[in-house]
Swiss-Prot record:
<comment type="similarity">
    <text>Belongs to the LipB family.</text>
</comment>
<feature type="binding site">
    <location>
        <begin position="71"/>
        <end position="78"/>
    </location>
    <ligand>
        <name>substrate</name>
    </ligand>
</feature>
<protein>
    <recommendedName>
        <fullName>Octanoyltransferase</fullName>
        <ecNumber>2.3.1.181</ecNumber>
    </recommendedName>
</protein>
<dbReference type="InterPro" id="IPR020605">
    <property type="entry name" value="Octanoyltransferase_CS"/>
</dbReference>
<comment type="function">
    <text>Catalyzes the transfer of endogenously produced octanoic acid from octanoyl-acyl-carrier-protein onto the lipoyl domains of lipoate-dependent enzymes. Lipoyl-ACP can also act as a substrate although octanoyl-ACP is likely to be the physiological substrate.</text>
</comment>
<dbReference type="GO" id="GO:0005737">
    <property type="term" value="C:cytoplasm"/>
</dbReference>
<feature type="binding site">
    <location>
        <begin position="151"/>
        <end position="153"/>
    </location>
    <ligand>
        <name>substrate</name>
    </ligand>
</feature>
<feature type="binding site">
    <location>
        <begin position="138"/>
        <end position="140"/>
    </location>
    <ligand>
        <name>substrate</name>
    </ligand>
</feature>
<comment type="pathway">
    <text>Protein modification; protein lipoylation via endogenous pathway; protein N(6)-(lipoyl)lysine from octanoyl-[acyl-carrier-protein]: step 1/2.</text>
</comment>
<keyword id="KW-0012">Acyltransferase</keyword>
<feature type="domain" description="BPL/LPL catalytic">
    <location>
        <begin position="32"/>
        <end position="207"/>
    </location>
</feature>
<keyword id="KW-0808">Transferase</keyword>
<keyword id="KW-0963">Cytoplasm</keyword>
<feature type="site" description="Lowers pKa of active site Cys">
    <location>
        <position position="135"/>
    </location>
</feature>
<feature type="active site" description="Acyl-thioester intermediate">
    <location>
        <position position="169"/>
    </location>
</feature>
<dbReference type="GO" id="GO:0036211">
    <property type="term" value="P:protein modification process"/>
</dbReference>
<dbReference type="Pfam" id="PF21948">
    <property type="entry name" value="LplA-B_cat"/>
</dbReference>
């Protein structure tokens, strides 16, 4: 019988491509008995272009590599100090639709920020989470055979200047924000427990096992 347990992997700071490849391999080889997983990772500086991404949104990449991804959405930036959470879930088994998963991820971030006294909200016209008009968290998902991969990227205490080299998520002039603008002491290490607690609560508090790389 299937056990509702999630494996949570803390992967630390990693290059984008090997993690992306591992995520694809996991999704391609999983079956109905495979436990769901959540991967927590920070990436070395990289621009990733979404499946429908348009080249004109990459303005001046400079020395930062641009990598094609198969997630939804347009171009975004990943770098140290940004907490990425990849959600490798069997949506059929969890009876979750894609829109419900997007809402769940947005609510995870809204709830996490609320605990820090930061009022944030999703936007109907542009997926992600915003503080005022500024974007603090980006979302991008892919569904294959009823299973999700990719996920969210929450700006914690990162250098935001590389976002000026692109139109983030395809929006010219989109301003970005990070948690440390309101909470200077914020780090990915002290944000992860809150983020994890909030997503697990919205997934009905399954058992989980925390694995560090």
């Amino acid at each position: 019988m299937y056990q509702d347990k999630i494996l949570v992997r803390q992967l630390g700071l990693q290059p984008y491509e090997p993690i992306s490849q591992a995520m694809h391999e996991f999704t391609d080889t999983r079956d109905d008995s495979t436990l769901d997983e959540i991967w927590l990772v920070e990436h070395y500086p990289v621009f990733t272009q979404g499946q429908a991404g348009k080249a004109e949104h990459i303005l001046m990449p400079g020395d930062i590599p641009v990598i094609q991804s198969d997630r939804g959405g347009q171009v975004t930036y990943h770098g140290p100090g940004q907490q990425v959470m990849y959600v490798l879930l069997n949506l059929k088994r969890r009876k979750l639709g894609v829109r419900e998963l997007v809402t769940l991820l947005e609510q995870t971030v809204v709830n996490t920020l609320a605990e820090l006294g930061i009022e944030a909200h999703p936007r109907a016209d542009a997926p992600g989470v915003y503080v005022g008009e500024k974007k603090i968290c980006s979302l991008g998902l892919r569904i294959r055979r009823g299973c999700s991969f990719h996920g969210l990227a929450l700006n914690v205490n990162m250098d935001l200047s590389p976002f000026l080299r692109i139109n983030p998520c395809g929006y010219a002039g989109m301003e970005m924000a990070k948690i440390s603008q309101w909470k200077p002491e914020a780090t990915t290490n002290n944000i992860v427990p809150r983020l994890l607690e909030n997503i697990l609560a919205l997934l009905n508090n399954p058992d989980f096992e925390y694995i560090t790389a």
